C-alpha cells in the first residue's frame, strides 16, 4: 500500500511539474553584439535620419509555452546615440532634444504581454525618456530559441514601436520630426 501511495505521489508530482510552464531568465547579449536599438526619424520631411544607441542592456524572462507571463527590463544610455555624424549627434544629445546631461538614461519596463499570433505579441510597458514616463506598445516577434555553440541557451526577438516625441517633452524642428520609429533586435543568453 505504501509503495502504491509513493508511486502515485511521484507520478502526480511529475505530471504537475510537466504541466507547469517555467519561464527562464535571460540576459540580453550586448557583449556579443547581438543586441540593437535602432531608430529612424524624418529630417524636415525630405529624408530620414537613421541611428542607433550603442550602450544598453537588460534582462527578460520568457517561456514559449506561456508568453503572456514574459517580462522585460531594459536600460539605455542616451549619450550612446550614434547617427554617423558627430555634429548631428552632439545636437541631438543637447538640451534642444534629448538633453543627455540631465537625462542620461531611458528605461523600459514591461507591464503586459498579449499574444497576437503563433510567434507575435504586443508588449506593453512603461518607457521613461527625457524624464517622462508613458505607456508604449512594442510589436514583438519571437525569432527562435535553442542551444548555442558555447554551451549556452539563447532566445531571440525583434520588435517595433512608434513614439511621438512630444509625449516625452521633446520638441523637433517641425511636425514631421515628431514621430520616431524604433526597431529593436536582441538575443538573450539564459542565466545558469
UniProtKB/Swiss-Prot annotation:
- Indicate the segments annotated as coiled coil, or none if absent: none
Q: Where in the cell is it found?
A: Periplasm
Gene3D superfamilies xref list:
Lipid/polyisoprenoid-binding, YceI-like
Provide the alphabetized UniProt keywords.
Answer: Periplasm, Signal
What does UniProt give as the signal peptide span?
1-23
The cross-references to InterPro entries, in alphabetical order and at most eight, read:
Lipid/polyisoprenoid-bd_YceI (IPR007372), TTHA0802/YceI-like_sf (IPR036761), UPF0312/YceI (IPR023480)
Q: Which SMART domains does the record match to this protein?
A: YceI
Any Gene Ontology CC annotation? periplasmic space
According to the lineage, what is the superkingdom?
Bacteria
Q: Which NCBIfam families match?
A: PRK03757.1 (NF002994)
Which HAMAP family does this entry report, sorted A to Z? Answer: UPF0312
Question: What family is it from?
Answer: Belongs to the UPF0312 family. Type 1 subfamily.
What is the protein name stated in its UniProt record?
UPF0312 protein PSPTO_5071
The organism of origin for this protein = Pseudomonas syringae pv. tomato (strain ATCC BAA-871 / DC3000)
Amino acid at each position: 500500500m505504501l509503495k502504491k501511495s509513493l508511486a502515485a505521489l511521484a507520478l502526480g508530482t511529475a505530471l504537475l511539474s510537466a504541466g507547469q510552464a517555467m519561464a527562464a531568465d535571460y540576459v540580453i547579449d550586448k557583449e556579443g553584439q547581438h543586441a540593437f536599438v535602432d531608430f529612424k526619424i524624418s529630417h524636415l520631411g525630405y529624408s530620414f535620419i537613421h541611428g542607433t544607441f550603442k550602450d544598453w542592456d537588460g534582462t527578460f524572462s520568457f517561456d514559449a509555452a506561456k508568453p503572456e507571463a514574459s517580462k522585460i527590463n531594459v536600460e539605455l544610455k542616451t549619450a550612446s546615440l550614434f547617427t554617423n555624424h558627430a555634429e548631428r549627434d552632439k545636437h541631438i544629445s543637447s538640451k534642444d532634444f534629448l538633453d543627455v546631461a540631465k537625462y542620461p538614461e531611458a528605461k523600459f519596463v514591461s507591464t503586459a504581454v498579449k499574444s497576437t499570433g503563433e510567434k507575435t505579441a504586443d508588449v506593453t510597458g512603461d518607457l521613461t525618456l527625457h524624464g517622462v514616463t508613458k505607456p508604449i506598445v512594442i510589436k514583438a516577434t519571437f525569432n527562435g530559441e535553442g542551444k548555442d555553440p558555447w554551451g549556452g541557451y539563447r532566445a531571440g526577438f525583434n520588435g517595433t514601436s512608434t513614439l511621438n516625441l512630444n509625449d516625452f517633452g521633446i520638441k523637433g524642428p517641425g511636425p514631421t520630426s515628431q514621430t520616431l520609429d524604433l526597431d529593436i533586435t536582441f538575443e538573450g543568453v539564459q542565466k545558469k
